[in-house]
Amino acid sequence: MTARYIAIDWGSTNLRAWLYQGEECLESRQSEAGVTRLNGRSPAAVLAEITQHWRDGATPVVMAGMVGSNVGWKIAPYLPLPAAFSDIGQQLTAVGDNIWIIPGLCVSRDDNHNVMRGEETQLLGARALAPSYVYVMPGTHCKWVLADRRQIHDFRTVLTGELHH
């Protein structure tokens, strides 16, 4: 039997949820209840609503994105680079019983001050599908990421995503 879990991408303006049994997605849902659009509801209430009939206390929930920011449910501290890919899963922030937020990543050097929140989970998926030394991650806040087989070394946010949107 493969483990059942819920994956959440909870950004500023949208919330997307997937129910998995192992590697198979059983169902997905989405909402416009991003962390800046809760309209007076608590994050716990919004989570309960979007995962209704999916979850018992034993079903883990792993969330990524702005839910871990200073405007989200609870701050999940950034993981500074360089960092091992495995460090991401070891730095989860608990927000409830069997509910966690994945940390974002940060770079702080004289030539680069940058953060990502949510894209780190896309990076884990990209690495699992096609290991590389450079990852180009399109989206609203497009990232270029430099890594090796074990570690993430650097990333840059580039304007191309904003130009597209």
PLM feature segments, named:
Residues 38, 106-165:
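Glycine-rich phosphate-binding loop plus the immediately following alpha-helix
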Residues 4-42:
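Short glycine-rich, Thr/Ser-proximal phosphate-binding strand/loop in the N-terminal lobe
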Residues 19-20, 74-76, 147-150:
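Short amphipathic alpha-helical segments
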Residues 41-54:
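Short, well-ordered amphipathic alpha-helical segments that serve as non-catalytic structural scaffolds
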Residues 11-16, 67-69, 140-143:
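Gly/Ser/Thr-rich loops at beta-strand to alpha-helix junctions
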Residues 54-116:
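Short beta-strand-loop/turn "lid" adjacent to the catalytic site in phosphate-handling enzymes
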Residues 5-9, 60-62, 133-137:
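Short glycine-aspartate micro-motif
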